[in-house]
Amino acid sequence: MKILFANVSLPVASRGKIPISILLFFSCFISVKAQEKQQDSTQLKVLDEVLVQAVRVNATSPITHSNVDKEALEKRNLGQDIPILLNYLPSVVTTTDVGAGVGYTGIRIRGINAQSTNVTINGIPYNDAESLGTFWVNLGDFASSVESLQLQRGVGTSTNGSGAFGASVNILTDAVSEKANAEISNSFGSFNTRKHTLKFSTGKLNDHVEIAGRLSQIKSDGYIDRAASNLKSYFLQASYVDDKTLIKALTFSGKEVTYQSWNGLEDLDLLKNDRTYNTAGMYTDANGETQFYDNEVDNYQQDHYQLHWNQRYNNNWSTNVGLNYTKGKGYFEQYKEDEAFADYGLEDVVMGGETISETDLIRRRWLDNDYYVANLGVNYKNDTWNIDFGTSYGYYDGAHFGEIIWAQYASNSEIRHHYYDGNGKKTDFNVFGKATYRLNSQWSLYGDLQVRFVGYKTTGLSSDRIPFNVDENYTFFNPKAGVSYNLNSNNNFYFSYARANREPNRDDFENNQTVKPEQLNDFELGWRHLQETFRFNVNAYYMLYNEQLVLTGNIDGVGNPVRTNSGKSYRLGLEVEAAVAITDQFSVQPNFTLSTNKNKETIVSQDGALTNLGKTNISFSPSFVAANALVYSPINGLQVSLLSKYVGEQYMGNTDSEKSKLDSYFVSDLNVSYELIFSQDNESKPFVKSILLTGLVNNLFNEKYISNGYYYTYDDTWTDPNQVTTIEGAGYYPQATTNFLIGATLKF
């Protein structure tokens, strides 16, 4: 009966019988007939979890968190990206450029954007080192290779990489399987969406070695015109395991080709009458007719290679060593009209005595980067102490360059003329120690100290051909502390404090060379209540910022959000989540977040003069977000869920302008899953162990809503030379109306 409402799934009778075919894919495959196998599988689980133990917390930790396992992901995994699968967790708002959850998607947690959310995979940082963003489009169908994930709200525990600045997502990939198994999964749906997945595991060969893998392709035409996606990916791992050792060598890769849709819609008439209209690739031909360039695409591939060695020495000591290499390379391609030769370092063209200073052209902007990471973790645990020491070093080397692949007038360019070249190098070293001390059966204390050293240097030209030279070094000290109190077996109370510091990203420096690092002091106070048929979590948070890099609402030429320091700001909120088993077959799982998110003082330029707007709302931070799941399980294997989401109104800028407001919306999805399980008890075991049928109707009530957009201003100095007038503009990303996905998975 699990839905993606983590930490609140209920132990009702309908969950008591978990199919063997599902358990084959769990990290701790358990044979119900063999106690020895059960012990082996438990050891496997413990060894696998060492991969993420340094960055995760347990159920009674004073850190606000949600856990999601493979079973919960499986019921909705029909091709949509991981952010969409997490949409119903507390304080989460998801967005998608193409409107249907395939391609470029995003997630905000407590209003905190992707650049401030730390993502790790097996303890290895996944955020892009320069932009600090997370590009889920490069991990097509990665949910099919996830064993579990933990979403921490607030600063959370010390982690590797750029660090959490308000939220973190820690992912553990597929665990070692005891027995050989395989899956074939296919799904189809609206907008010509289809997903094809093949998975396998050899099981443990000679009781020690397992090889497992996945091959996937997802294709979709998208809800927005021409916003097609073609995502190919694989996951492959080889593992060696014995009683105290787990060694994993794994590689996963994703290649995405997506037609661009990051322009959104600014024309309100189009938004009303033709909300799927896409301006990307638009140009005017020689006959004055509007055309669309057919290869206005984003084309990028990312390859990951990881090696992990987990070692348990006894019941107290364990270590983890992790190595990573990531190779990323790709470009986005654009047709551009009437571009000045001078903007590309080219000379004007003279033809028949006429000087031509502009041309239509097709350009590509490239990224070619290498990322290396080394992690080391040591854990000591006894009945009183749980202590972790960890260190991580990351090195990033990224080339940025642009090339012209076609021009109406070639000027003095060469084939694939580079019109800018730049480079960014970043080092990231951190060391941390964290400990939980159990005073007695009721009280426990938590402490966490981290020091992080960051160096960032750029050379060459920006994409606008402006010299771009940054040489910055930062030292950050991030202390954390907390206390947890178990009143009894049903009630747990906690309080925590955490500080986070974070460096600006590449885009921040391009927009403002004097940008400052940001700092967050996070206070969390919570109560967890647990009964057999009722669970209830309440958490209050106060996040106090200094120089928070808030989204201005504007985007750059490739759809990346523009940020700026906001001085003093804060987020104050209350999160409530619950789960109630009405009967053995029916449950309700609601959650909501009520918050106020404010810049303490906002000064802007309006109509040529500086204006103090005083206290304003932080952009993209709705004051009310709620979700609910009505779950009905009439028979074993069948689950019907009505999932609902409400997001209150929000501002896309920090000026409280009506022009920047996004309306509230309420949407519901209907999810049905049925697993037909074939008996494995008789001698003639069937070849197919089970068939899982899944259906999903998104936006059941056909709401025409907008979950994301952008807002900008500029000064009009030409209409009246004696007056400056500030002009406002906004663009919107319409989301899909009612659509569906259906799928079938055969498990062998």
Protein language model regions, located:
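Face-selective signature of the C-terminal outer-membrane beta-barrel domain
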Residues: 299-461, 484-496, 534-540, 586-589, ...
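Short acidic/polar hinge/loop motifs at secondary-structure boundaries
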Residues: 125-153, 172
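Transmembrane beta-barrel wall of Gram-negative outer-membrane proteins
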Residues: 181, 188-219, 224-261, 308-314, ...
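N-terminal periplasmic "start-of-domain" segments of outer-membrane beta-barrel proteins
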Residues: 44-79, 106
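Extracytoplasmic beta-strand/coil segments of soluble accessory domains associated
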Residues: 83-125, 147
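C-terminal beta-signal and adjacent terminal beta-strands/loops
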Residues: 588, 646-651, 674-748
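Gram-negative outer-membrane beta-barrel transporters
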Residues: 441, 542-544, 564-655
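Membrane-embedded beta-barrel scaffold of Gram-negative outer-membrane proteins
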Residues: 312, 318-324, 486, 492-498, ...
